[in-house]
């Protein structure tokens, strides 16, 4: 799910892709590891798109290239500094239809029977199909100069992020001759006891969210969990 963006790119560039556990170590589940077979050399590549700045030791030892979204320079282990590269933000996309989501998900589950979390494995394939949009939907359009749309998540441990997002919504609402639409996603109403956060009655489906975001005069981005580069930044770009 989190690495569908990279899988999409690989499937577009390489036609012969094989899913296998052979040649790989027991990595943290939040990664994408693959071996690129070139004419003169094989390259072992490990992609980390997690929120935090930490590193996976097994990934560092195994890989030739350790590509990471969220990096703090002073946390890079010196002995591996030459293989660590920043790759910027990413976001999940729909890469399989329902039929292929089921077929490929089950096929890869059978090939990887040592995995303990079968539900998470299957849900990753389902979620990219159910909740995300194909990359072709990410095309700019002419914005409406009288309209601002912004929808965001409330985070329990990121008060500054919530505060920044709330202030943007408040400022956008106060602008004359401009229509603001949006708010915080529902599901964490208990956080609103001491605040006045505008919480939506229902979530926007993803295609509608994209259309309204593209129509909006401006986009607003903040660091998210653990100060990470969130999906919104990648989508906005």
Enumerate the predicted regions with their spans.
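A short, conserved alpha-helix in the catalytic core of glycosyltransferases
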Residues: 237
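Nucleotide-sugar donor-binding catalytic core of glycosyltransferases
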Residues: 1-234
């Amino acid at each position: 799910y989190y690495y569908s963006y990279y899988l999409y790119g690989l499937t577009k560039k390489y036609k012969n892709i094989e899913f296998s556990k052979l040649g790989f170590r027991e990595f943290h589940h939040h990664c994408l590891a693959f071996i690129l077979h070139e004419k003169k050399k094989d390259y072992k590549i490990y992609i980390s798109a997690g929120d935090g700045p930490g590193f996976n030791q097994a990934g560092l030892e195994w890989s030739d290239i350790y590509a990471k979204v969220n990096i703090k320079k002073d946390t890079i282990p010196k002995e591996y500094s030459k293989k660590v590269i920043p790759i910027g933000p990413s976001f999940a996309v729909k890469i399989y239809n329902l039929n292929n989501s089921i077929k490929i998900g089950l096929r890869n589950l059978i090939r990887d029977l040592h995995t303990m979390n079968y539900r998470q494995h299957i849900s990753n394939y389902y979620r990219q199909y159910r909740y995300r949009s194909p990359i072709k939907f990410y095309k700019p359009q002419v914005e409406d100069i009288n309209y601002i749309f912004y929808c965001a998540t409330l985070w329990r441990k990121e008060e500054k992020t919530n505060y920044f997002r709330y202030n943007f919504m408040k400022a956008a609402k106060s602008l004359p001759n401009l229509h603001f639409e949006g708010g915080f996603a529902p599901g964490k109403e208990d956080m609103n006891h001491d605040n006045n956060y505008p919480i939506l009655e229902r979530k926007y489906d993803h295609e509608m969210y994209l259309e309204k975001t593209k129509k909006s005069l401006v986009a607003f981005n903040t660091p998210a969990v653990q100060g990470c580069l969130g999906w919104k930044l990648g989508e906005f770009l």
